């Protein structure tokens, strides 16, 4: 039993210069395997992510176009309000004697309400853009994480064979037996 354990211990200590052998130190090989898996995922997943980002970009651009159309509608409303204001000013000249202060108050209310409407539309456009950007970023993060996790699981499943698993268990049992004999 001790010879079997020693043979596994010596497998892990083969000289690295000029030779090729099995690396049985699983903790040392996992970062290398993970870096290879991530490299492959990034290399092959780049096209998928670019397509996803292009789709999101188109949605954001469509949202911006819609917001611009709303803005143009607000500008049209502002022009209508200005035309109405000119009409009110004309009527104000006619009724100046009867109620100059009332007309001025209506004019200010009209300008303020139009300004508030325009500001609300601008805020809505900005909030929509921020929301779409954040949603796109979150979806891309989730998809990348899922693809990386699936790739890592697939790599781990393909690397572990039944025989290697049993040999590792037997070697560890042998080491624990040796440690128990030493402590007794």
Swiss-Prot record:
The chain crosses the membrane at residues 27-49. CDD domains: ATP-synt_Fo_b (cd06503). Keywords: ATP synthesis, CF(0), Chloroplast, Hydrogen ion transport, Ion transport, Membrane, Plastid, Thylakoid, Transmembrane, Transmembrane helix, Transport. It is found in: Plastid, Chloroplast thylakoid membrane. Coiled coil: none annotated. InterPro entries: ATP_synth_b/b'su_bac/chlpt. One of its GO terms (molecular function) is proton-transporting ATP synthase activity, rotational mechanism. The keyword Ion transport applies. F-type ATPases have 2 components, F(1) - the catalytic core - and F(0) - the membrane proton channel. F(1) has five subunits: alpha(3), beta(3), gamma(1), delta(1), epsilon(1). F(0) has four main subunits: a(1), b(1), b'(1) and c(10-14). The alpha and beta chains form an alternating ring which encloses part of the gamma chain. F(1) is attached to F(0) by a central stalk formed by the gamma and epsilon chains, while a peripheral stalk is formed by the delta, b and b' chains. In plastids the F-type ATPase is also known as CF(1)CF(0). This is ATP synthase subunit b, chloroplastic. It comes from Barbarea verna (Land cress). The lineage of its organism: Eukaryota, Viridiplantae, Streptophyta, Embryophyta, Tracheophyta. The gene is atpF.
